[in-house]
Regions:
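Residue-level preference for nonpolar/small residues embedded in alpha-helices
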Residues: 70-71, 183, 251, 376
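Active-site neighborhood of glycoside hydrolase catalytic domains
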Residues: 279-285, 289, 294-392
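Bacterial N-terminal signal peptides that target proteins for export
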Residues: 2-11
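Contiguous, structured surface segment used for ligand recognition
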Residues: 23-165
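Feature activates predominantly on carbohydrate-active enzymes
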Residues: 105-332
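C-terminal motif of bacterial Sec signal peptides marking the signal peptidase cleavage site
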Residues: 18-21
Length: 392
């Protein structure tokens, strides 16, 4: 072979060698049978799968920050699952590409269509959220490989999916047991993996107040700590270990942002007017008896609740909710309302005076004290609605 011919062929030969080096000889095919089960999976069983290698590119629409972030998520998932590093770009590419797109005419904003061929993967969502759920399907469909020396492949076919329910929630109770921010982020990642779109954050309980309220610092100075925790209900055995912890407002906002990046809305819950012993231990004047109260170490339903006849208590709850709504942009604000015994209200002069002031009468199925709670919750609903939010 003469030198001129060799010089002409050399670049092409180098490109072939380089491309071949990018593609491992062996492949392991993933599985589209994922949870939650998609609405429809149609496999092209006799078709070559799509092989993911180091030259694979994830393509997202230019100038779309949410899609860029989603593309980065997918690249991370592929690296974690297979050991292969792929590229992310906003430049068009027609082959060996995973192409992300939005089509608002699909009919289901959170739905998506995933089309896998040997040449490319086209993922189209009804919105950015739909695309995100689509990459989670790819995530779950990937084979688990060790070091990237064996190539991952996605089976050829089409997946069509959309959620059956608009609200898909998961609750974490940090009032009874505190969990650090790092753990909550892990749980949010698991929620995202399973297409959950609401994180219900139960922040307060008889056993602990877990969110910083700047106007009422004792809520966390006192209310976030308890002496011990019951570990055997029958014998009333306690572990003897102090339990404490709370989230600063900045940490709560960090969780809100982390969840939002994964298309999850954080719904805060401040349990009112029952399950508030931790608040009463912090501010005894908010209770019917004036205390003293102690952050509880056992679990159940307890008689001491916020005094609904005390105007100071109502102002306290509104102040708390105002700060909560400043932290959490969620449309929904959860205020509990459950398991509020009325024994203290029945004997409380302030509660009875408020009942008389409101002209509340006993009804066949509703005591005066039950109706007092209705009044109390209605006042809080007005406060929430005034901020353009909805009460749960």
């Amino acid at each position: 072979m003469n030198k001129k011919l060799l010089s002409r062929l050399a670049p092409g030969l180098f490109a072939v060698v380089l491309f071949t080096a990018c593609r491992p000889a062996a492949t392991v095919k993933g599985n589209l049978d994922v949870i939650p089960q998609p609405q429809e999976i149609v496999l092209a069983r006799d078709t070559t799968p799509f092989i993911i290698d180091r030259s694979t590119t994830i393509v997202y629409p230019a100038t779309n920050e949410k899609m860029h972030r989603t593309a980065d998520f997918l690249a991370t998932f592929i690296k974690e699952m297979t050991g292969t590093e792929v590229r992310v770009s906003d430049k068009e590419k027609s082959s060996n590409a995973i192409i992300l797109a939005v089509d608002s005419t699909m009919g289901h904003p959170e739905g998506y269509k995933l089309q896998i061929t040997p040449e490319k993967v086209l993922l189209t969502g009804g919105s950015e959220a739909g695309v995100f759920y689509g990459i989670q399907t790819i995530h779950k469909a990937l084979p688990i490989l060790k070091d990237g020396k064996v190539a991952a492949a996605l089976p050829a076919g089409t997946v069509t999916d959309f959620p059956r329910f608009r609200y898909r929630g998961f609750m974490i109770d940090v009032g009874r047991h505190f969990f650090p921010v790092s753990y909550l982020k892990q749980m949010i990642d698991l929620m995202a993996l399973h297409n959950i779109n609401y994180f219900h954050w139960h922040l307060t309980e008889d056993q602990g107040w877990r969110i910083e309220i700047k106007k009422y610092p004792k809520l966390t100075e006192i209310g976030s700590k308890r002496d011990s925790t019951i570990i055997d209900w029958e014998t009333k055995k306690f572990d003897g270990k102090p339990h404490s912890g709370f989230y600063t407002q900045d940490e709560a906002r960090e969780i809100v942002r982390y969840a939002a990046d994964r298309f999850i809305t954080v719904v805060p819950e401040i349990d009112l007017p029952g399950h508030t012993t931790a608040a009463l231990a912090s501010y005894p004047e908010l209770g019917c008896t004036g205390g003293p109260y102690k952050v509880l170490c056992s679990f159940g339903v307890f008689p001491d609740v916020l005094c609904a006849g005390n105007d100071q208590t109502l102002q306290f709850t509104k102040d708390v909710l105002d700060e909560i709504m400043d932290i959490f942009p969620s449309e929904y604000i959860h205020i509990g309302g459950d398991e509020c015994p009325k024994s203290r209200w029945e004997k409380c002069p302030k509660c009875q005076a408020k009942i008389k002031e409101l002209g509340i009468k006993t009804l066949p199925k509703h005591s005066k004290e039950n109706q007092l709670q209705t009044y109390f919750m209605s006042e809080l609903e007005k406060e929430i609605n005034a901020h353009g939010r909805r009460m749960l």
